[in-house]
């Protein structure tokens, strides 16, 4: 084979590669994935990240159990139903009953924002421990449709200046920033996949939230881009 022919083959490969990747991406998006999402208020709105997952993966089934005010393991606002550790058994049962014999492919956890509130400032060492306990509860659940799913942990997005200007969330940005590092270690230790929500590419917490916390549609879409990459690769 001459050098000229080799160069033509290389050039043709370079031209065709983007088309192949596009075709693979479209095929991946057609996957009929079964996804269980667990989050806080950012998972409850019409433009929420679970909704964005459903839009991006139209053939997927997304079973969402998110709730405003939810924490990983703290009693928030005096409401025990907001403590994920306290209600995880009940929620896993709901998920298993909803999916029946069809196993979940992925469980996506996006929690921690409320664990970073000022009222919990002196208990931050408990947050990664609680996350690990939550993951272990999921992995050891009695429901085969749940306990064999791949788990994706998303660390919290930043706190914006509007949120930090309130007593309720004062100093929270530093706390959730630390969570991203701690959650990555927990994910690795427990065999989970990890997405650094604090460093979401393109996310501007000041312009993509009205209050420094709750993501608009654009922010929610950016948050799930790395999640999609893990699911469809």
Sequence positions of predicted segments:
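Short hydrophobic "helix-edge" motifs at membrane interfaces and signal-peptide entry regions
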Residues: 9, 30-31, 206-207
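Conserved SGNH/GDSL esterase-like catalytic core that processes O-acyl groups on lipids
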Residues: 28-37, 42-132
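Bacterial Sec-dependent N-terminal signal peptides
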Residues: 1-26
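Alpha-helical transmembrane segments and their juxtamembrane interfaces
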Residues: 16-18, 50, 226
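Alpha-helical cap/lid subdomain in secreted, periplasmic
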Residues: 3, 25, 89-233
